[in-house]
């Protein structure tokens, strides 16, 4: 499991996940993301799932937990480009409304309120 965390604006972080996300990798990712949220600047997380090949229930818990943390700052979450299998998992978990098929740039523009077309 490999991941990248990039602050694209003062309020928005993009998390790129690669490989397999299981309970072994979740703790490291959770600590970094929660630290950014609790510093008080992050209000939006864009999870780029394009490079993710597998995620178990601990990965869903990771996303749900960060969504709860963001609720305290009226934050938002975007689940970007999940695979067909992960799309089903997110839909069954009630996370369907947060999914988006787009580029990172389009997701960032949506967060900023810029809508093209």
Curated annotation (Swiss-Prot):
Residue numbers bearing the Phosphoserine modification: 58
Annotated STAS domain residues: 2-115
Pfam family, one: STAS
Signal peptide: none
Modifications made to the protein after synthesis: Phosphorylated by SpoIIAB on a serine residue.
MF-aspect GO terms: anti-sigma factor antagonist activity; antisigma factor binding
InterPro entries per the UniProt record, alphabetical: Anti-sigma_ant, Anti-sigma_F_ant, STAS_dom, STAS_dom_sf
Domain of life the protein comes from: Bacteria
UniProt keyword annotations, A-Z: Phosphoprotein, Sporulation
A GO biological process held by the record: sporulation resulting in formation of a cellular spore
PANTHER family xref list: ANTI-SIGMA FACTOR ANTAGONIST TM_1081-RELATED (PTHR33495:SF2), ANTI-SIGMA FACTOR ANTAGONIST TM_1081-RELATED-RELATED (PTHR33495)
Family: Belongs to the anti-sigma-factor antagonist family.
Protein purpose: In the phosphorylated form it could act as an anti-anti-sigma factor that counteracts SpoIIAB and thus releases sigma f from inhibition.
NCBIfam families documented for this protein: ant_ant_sig (TIGR00377), spore_II_AA (TIGR02886)
Protein name listed in UniProt: Anti-sigma F factor antagonist
Species of provenance: Lysinibacillus sphaericus
């Amino acid at each position: 499991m490999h991941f990248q965390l990039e602050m694209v604006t003062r309020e928005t972080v993009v998390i790129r996940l690669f490989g397999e996300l299981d309970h072994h990798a979740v703790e490291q990712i959770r600590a970094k993301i929660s630290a950014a949220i609790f510093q008080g600047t992050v209000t939006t997380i864009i999870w780029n799932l394009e490079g993710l090949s597998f995620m178990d229930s601990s990965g869903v818990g990771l996303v749900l937990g960060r969504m709860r943390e963001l609720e305290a700052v009226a934050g938002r979450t975007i689940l970007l480009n999940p695979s067909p299998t992960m799309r089903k998992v997110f839909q069954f978990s009630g996370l369907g409304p947060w999914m988006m098929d787009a580029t990172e740039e389009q997701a960032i523009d949506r967060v900023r309120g810029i809508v093209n077309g």
